[in-house]
Amino acid sequence: MHFVSDSDPWFVILPPGAGLEALLIRRGGTPEPISEKVVINYRVEPGFESPSRHSRFWDYAENYFDRRPDPDRGLLGNGTSGEFAYNDKTMSFAADGIPILPYTDVGTFNPYPLFTITAKDSASGKVLASTKTLIPVSTEMGCRNCHGGPWRWKNISGMADDTARDILRRHDRAHGTDLMARAEKGKPRLCQSCHADPAINAVGDGKRLPLSTSIHGLHANYIPVKGADACGLCHPSHKSGATRYARGVHASVGLSCVNCHGSMSDHAISLLRFEEGKRSATSLIKHLRPVAVQARADIKPRKPWINGPDCLACHVDFKKPSDNPSAFNKWTGEAADLYKNRTDDTGSLRCVACHGTVHAEYPARNPYNARRDNLQPLQYSKTPYAIGANRGCEICHREAKRDEVHHRNMLRMVRRTVRQ
């Protein structure tokens, strides 16, 4: 899910700018990914075409990023409709920086806007394939729970000015900065101008802790609740919130944030341990007590957005997990190993292409429409399960197969059934 801080006059954590990726596969005995002589376009559903009507980002974009995108265009030039470009590195078509927001032109909130994706022959214009998917996007960052203020947008979502101002005042008082004065003069700072953040390829100033480490490390010392409820104070994951972004099969069987990411204190310790030697890391970690292990030293250091929970920590050999699975402290070695980036054994198919995106693994259940996340498996296989599940190899291969080409144990039958 793409978060948008929605606090543009005061600071920006993340700007509008989500991405779509597409794989086009020629079906047959030996399916073949197509990378040339095609044009793939995307278009958002009606009501989401004018994000600049609902955000102050375009008034401040030049201040933060030295760019002045046109209204309803993102920092990379893409709009809410446009054309994909082929990415040789990921071997997929990509449209990055789409400035989508959860606010609609008719005054409703929906953090799951649908996009229609159409592939055409570049010479003849013939439609080769068409499908629908969504971009999960939310402005429901719960800073107000501690910093005060209402929700900015219709008491549903977004960061109010009162909330953002309190954050800056506290930052200035704790760290001797002048962020409030800068913002009041119309020159607010991008958080990543000081704090490194691999999420947007920001290197920071090299002196401060990375952004994710700073935020989790500080707040873990103050948040009074435990377990997944601690995550839901800030992230749009709480079951009573407007977003409820944990939609996948993991959530449906009762797993929570903690099963993969650890408790708030454990999560923070893992990030702070990567920064050992920095004075601020030492200060933040010294009062944190681990939950899942005996000592802080037992928690493996990790870099945000690079070392994440490894799917195979629970799905050993792609088999059924244990009754109480946990991927905490079993981190991926590099970004390429993260679920969102990982490929199958052939190296040509991404895991998410068949199994669904992060936090919405098939079969998913969307709070705004139960089928909304499952449109592609329903389109291609008439079930909400992973595309090709239950030995459905003929979806791409046009015939049954006996070889487990993509990963081990892929030919076993799905063990759960879900009504859609």
Predicted segments, located by residue:
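Inter-heme linker and motif-flanking segments adjacent to c-type heme-binding CXXCH motifs
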Residues: 123-130, 150-183, 197-420
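Extended, solvent-exposed segments with strong compositional bias
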Residues: 57-101
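Beta-strand-rich domain onsets/edges
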Residues: 1-19, 25
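Domain-length functional cores that host ligand/cofactor binding and catalytic or interaction surfaces
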Residues: 184-193
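Short, solvent-exposed loop/turn segments enriched in Ser/Thr/Gly
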Residues: 15-20, 111-115
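Short flexible loop/turn segments that cap and initiate beta-strands
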Residues: 17-18, 23-60
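Extended acidic/polar, glycine-enriched regions
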Residues: 85-185
